[in-house]
Amino acid sequence: MITAYDSVKLNKTLEKVWGALTFLNDKTDGGFFKLRQVSDTSLLKKSSYYKYVNGQKVEDGWMSQIEGIVADKPSKVRGDRAEIVMFEEAGSNPVLLKSFIQGEALVDVGGNKLGILCAGGTGGDSGAALDGLKTIYYDPESYLVLPYRHTYTED
């Protein structure tokens, strides 16, 4: 799952992801080729295909999917399970902190981690847009995030 606060940022990210999938399908001699007969839209790609079993049309295949979500409201990052949830352009997302906290439920089932949350992108904004990323960065353990300290951090 790839999320961004606005559709422009999400679409630019998804264009790159879809380009990478096309490359894998076209240039890896079939090694990474996955059919996308059932879902192949600008916001969702699912590796599945239709087959007939006893005359019934059924979906089959890997069933893995990549979905893009405009998460301008934290409630849009709910109700699913995911192995990876990416918060693109996290430094430009005024609802990042609440979305990140709610996103934890997508990768955790009964206290067992089944996936990870990733936040990345711009840190160049200021004010409310940057507050969530700043909070997570300076107190990573509270949000189950691996801390990153560079040589310029005093503590």
Which residues make up each language-model segment?
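Conserved nucleotide-state-sensing and coupling region of NTP-binding domains
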Residues: 2-72
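A generic structural motif
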Residues: 28-48, 113-121, 144-154
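Conserved P-loop NTPase catalytic core
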Residues: 55-56, 63-67, 81-85, 98, ...
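Residues immediately C-terminal
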Residues: 73, 92-93
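SF2 helicase motor core recognition
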Residues: 74-81
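Walker B catalytic acidic pair
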Residues: 86-92
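Short, conserved "post-DEAD/DEAH" coupling segment immediately C-terminal to helicase motif II
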Residues: 95-115, 120
